[in-house]
Amino acid sequence: LLLFISPILLDDWKHRSMLAVKPIRQWKYLLQKISSYWLVNMALVILALFVVFLVQSLSFGWDNLTTPFLVFRGEEEALMFPLQFIGIVLLFAACVFLFLINLVAWCNQLSRNKMVGFIAGVMVIWAEPIFRSMKIYPSFADKLPLYYVNFGSVIQGMKDDFYTTGTFTISNGCASLLVGAFVFFLLTVGTSFWQERHRRGGLV
């Protein structure tokens, strides 16, 4: 759903006149647009998690929220409270959404074709499981945000052989995704400035 509607909501080609009525710098305009869309997506995620845990609590009792459950961190077993797990999921989802939204925003600046952003997002989402199935494990994989987009594997699949090195962690993932999002934001702003200068040069 995110990939289908992102190119539409983040499309600036048809709305450049908004900058005339709202005289702010281009990078501030893009930042506000990306931030507002990110907040909407996070609100939907929080609502979905709330409904899931509400149904679960009504079915199995409210004590279920305070009862720790078993998780794996590498080869080690540990106990984690449900609310702690929800916090980790929300933090990681926030980073993943921020990365994907900035990626799609950059694709929108590069091409008017909205399918470009959709295809780029799909490729990033499926890159990690495809590489894993092909036994492609670069030494720097834990530094690449695309290996963390499939965050279910990171949060739940720590005992998988792909994570036995212990370098694929939540903290590394959040840092990698935030850096990746910042890089794509800079690329989006830079591409926008270049296109605007090129357009003005063409008019002259």
Annotate each PLM feature:
Residues L1-L10, Q32-Q109, Q156-Y163, T167-I170, ...:
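Secretory targeting signals
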Residues L3-K22, Q26:
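Transmembrane helix boundary and interhelical loop/hinge segments in multi-pass membrane proteins
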Residues G61-Q84, M115-F118, M123-V204:
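Terminal transmembrane helical anchor/hairpin motif
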Residues L30-I34, I119-V122:
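Conserved glycine-rich helix-kink/hinge and helix-boundary motifs of the Major Facilitator Superfamily
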Residues R25, R112-K114:
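Short loop-to-helix capping motifs
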